[in-house]
Amino acid sequence: MVSFAFVFTSPTKRQRVRGAAMDDGGHVQAMREGFHINWMNMRDASTGQVMWESGEWDCDQEEMEAQIPCEILRCRQVSRELNFSSVEVITSLRLVQSVIFKGELLEEWNFHFGFVIPNSTNTWQQTIEAAEEEEMLPAELLSGNVVIETTFFDGEYPIMTQRVRIWYL
């Protein structure tokens, strides 16, 4: 299982990220303070129908909850749009999304955005392909037991981690 522990410390301290030491300079701290998720939605990628959306993101909250219609589990592909703002330049924005079921890592995906202009607001769309129907767990079993952990990076430097517990309706 992949776990991330982030301690936001002064620029003179060092921290470990996935086993590699890194210098936590002032720019990294400024990136963390200036990065914000504005809104997100998820659509059925084949029809474009919005299945879920939220404009309320508290990036400082340890874990959020989302109520998502169970019909989303029937979509072959889900398109996720994420709108974010950054005060600082980010040279290589990427995210790692981990799907955690009852404390165990089920899946992990990596997405790469690239360069982010300072003082900009951007919309990033990703398409996520569903597992085969016979491999899917039922909504009743998943609901409340799945946490989506998304960690944003500039290259190897962590910017922010957001955890969302999923409840299927």
Regions picked out by a protein language model, each given a short descriptive name:
Residues 2-117, 133-135, 139-169:
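N-terminal onset of structured domains
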Residues 120-128:
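Short strand-edge motifs at loop-to-beta-strand transitions and within beta-strands
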